[in-house]
Amino acid sequence: RLKGLVESIINTYENLENFKTNASREWLLNIKGLGFESVDGILNYLCKREILVVDSYSLRLAFCLGYEFENYEELREFFQSGVESEQENLCKILEKKCELYELYQIFHALIVAFAKQSFKGQKLSPKGEEWIKILKEDL
């Protein structure tokens, strides 16, 4: 997969800088072996685009909070709109000015860290249940 991606980038964009500036989500989704999560990761982390990566951890967290989504896009748009609407407050909490793509990176990393601490397989750990209860109180 990686070899095919690199070859496609070189053949289409000639170099990484041109790719980072001009690659589209649709173009990447047409690369064999790349799905939404991988494509959004490339666009956010490599290309510094304003797109949030969501994954199975994000889905589990949303489900534990009482939300259900039909597909990846609904899940991404839900979390992405929440981060975007709170951009100013999040920057204050972090005590620095952050671009939206950076906030998406931080938010995704926090979800991953939370999930690794809170889930034992598909089930919440006792500590995870405690944290989810606190989060639900703030909703």
Task: State where each predicted segment sits.
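Catalytic cores of DNA base-excision repair glycosylases
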Residues: 1-139
